[in-house]
């Protein structure tokens, strides 16, 4: 893999409880909304679980993902192709954190910042079930 080793951690406040955040990260029908303009391989499961694998595309950039760890408040992906490394999500009531370490020719922190901004906006529109 060509590129530079990069590591970035961002934690932001969000207007949502942990359960809503979890659903927005684990359910492809939700994360495909806020991760636009990325597209995804066909055949995604309804909910990601350990060993789920899929491909994301952003223009010509292709990244393979595999869920390697999943707890009630965290998820970790192994990444390869466009980024060789990992992406870890952690969340709780009112906050979400994204940590990425990997080798890429593109600036990982820029994409991470934009994605967290989109997630914040998406979560602000979600309603807490009664």
Residue map of PLM features:
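Beta-strand/loop substructures that line and gate deep hydrophobic ligand-binding cavities in soluble
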Residues: 74-130
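Hydrophobic ligand-binding cavity/cleft-lining segments
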Residues: 1-45
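Short, intrinsically disordered, mixed-charge
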Residues: 23-37, 72, 117, 121-128
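Short, hydrophobic/aromatic-rich segments at coil-to-beta transitions
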Residues: 47-55, 69-78
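A short, surface-exposed loop/turn module that caps and links secondary-structure elements
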Residues: 42, 55, 60-71
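Hydrophobic/aromatic beta-strand elements that line small-molecule binding cavities or substrate pockets
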Residues: 12, 63-69, 85-93
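C-terminal and inter-domain tail/linker signature
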Residues: 47-51, 64-65, 88-90, 99
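Glycine-centered tight beta-turn/hairpin loop motif at sheet-sheet or coil-to-beta transitions
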Residues: 5, 58-60, 82-84
């Amino acid at each position: 893999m060509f590129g530079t080793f990069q590591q970035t951690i961002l934690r932001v406040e969000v207007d949502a409880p942990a359960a809503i955040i979890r659903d927005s990260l684990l359910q492809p029908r939700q994360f495909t909304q806020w991760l636009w303009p990325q597209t995804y391989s066909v055949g995604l499961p309804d909910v990601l679980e350990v060993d789920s694998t899929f491909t994301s595309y952003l223009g010509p950039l292709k990244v393979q993902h595999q869920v390697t760890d999943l707890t009630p408040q965290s998820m970790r992906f192994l990444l390869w192709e466009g980024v060789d490394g990992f992406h870890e999500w952690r969340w709780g009531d009112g906050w979400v954190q994204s940590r990425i370490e990997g080798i890429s020719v593109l600036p990982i922190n820029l994409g991470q910042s934009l994605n967290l901004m989109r997630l914040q906006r998406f979560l602000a529109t979600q309603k807490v079930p009664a």
